[in-house]
């Protein structure tokens, strides 16, 4: 999770986020080298009187500055396309969860379980327990099993929202009348925080997402408990 005065990304929790961090470092290195070269040329031009004002043709130079940017773009595009393919690939998910955005809360439905659906509201600041995080805690966390592929279906009941979980490298738009599909896999247990990342009205900043990744045994116990509680609640 993020912490005050943090530099860089949150700790990666999924293989996708690890790939995104490597790609970020790879691209940043290329940008740094290009910027250094441009800065060096500018300084050289400002500090020397030897300029080629009479040069009319330089095919070798033109060939180099045409081919070199093309090679650099390929070096950026290939890993980017690979990660895009990995993010869209969904193979035999263990379960499917539908997340619906509302003004201003989230609702979740486990489509593989009967009557397992609930709303998730932010806990007001005055109701927080010691140690809980302001504007990030919810009354009902979404619990999922770790180390298993999970398919998320994202949509909205009213306006545009965005379901975002930085530690997992996920961000999907919630659009009314349309289902967006993403996959997530957590490599470790823990509680992870996200928020709506699309301005959706006056309480946009009060739509946190809390995802608890746990063992499969704990998840099955939690799902059974939630089903029993919801069945009793709606009798």
From Swiss-Prot:
Pfam families: COX2, COX2_TM. Keywords: Copper, Electron transport, Magnesium, Membrane, Metal-binding, Mitochondrion, Mitochondrion inner membrane, Phosphoprotein, Respiratory chain, Translocase, Transmembrane, Transmembrane helix, Transport. Its EC number is 7.1.1.9. Residues 46-59 are mitochondrial matrix. It comes from the Eukaryota. Cu cation A2 binds at residues 196, 198, 200, 204. It is found in: Mitochondrion inner membrane. Cu cation A1 binds at residues 161, 196, 200, 207. PROSITE patterns: COX2, COX2_CUA, COX2_TM. GO terms for molecular function: copper ion binding; cytochrome-c oxidase activity. It is a multi-pass membrane protein. Residues 1-14, 88-235 are mitochondrial intermembrane. InterPro entries: CcO_II (IPR045187), CcO_II-like_C (IPR002429), CcO_II_C (IPR034210), Copper_CuA (IPR001505), Cupredoxin (IPR008972), Cyt_c_oxidase_su2 (IPR014222), Cyt_c_oxidase_su2_TM_dom (IPR011759), Cyt_c_oxidase_su2_TM_sf (IPR036257). Its main location: mitochondrion. It catalyses: 4 Fe(II)-[cytochrome c] + O2 + 8 H(+)(in) = 4 Fe(III)-[cytochrome c] + 2 H2O + 4 H(+)(out). Its cofactor is Cu cation. GO terms for biological process: ATP synthesis coupled electron transport. GO terms for cellular component: mitochondrial inner membrane; respiratory chain complex IV. NCBIfam families: CoxB. Belongs to the cytochrome c oxidase subunit 2 family. Component of the cytochrome c oxidase (complex IV, CIV), a multisubunit enzyme composed of 14 subunits. The complex is composed of a catalytic core of 3 subunits MT-CO1, MT-CO2 and MT-CO3, encoded in the mitochondrial DNA, and 11 supernumerary subunits COX4I, COX5A, COX5B, COX6A, COX6B, COX6C, COX7A, COX7B, COX7C, COX8 and NDUFA4, which are encoded in the nuclear genome. Component of the cytochrome c oxidase, the last enzyme in the mitochondrial electron transport chain which drives oxidative phosphorylation. The respiratory chain contains 3 multisubunit complexes succinate dehydrogenase (complex II, CII), ubiquinol-cytochrome c oxidoreductase (cytochrome b-c1 complex, complex III, CIII) and cytochrome c oxidase (complex IV, CIV), that cooperate to transfer electrons derived from NADH and succinate to molecular oxygen, creating an electrochemical gradient over the inner membrane that drives transmembrane transport and the ATP synthase. This is Cytochrome c oxidase subunit 2. It comes from Didelphis virginiana (North American opossum). The gene is MT-CO2.
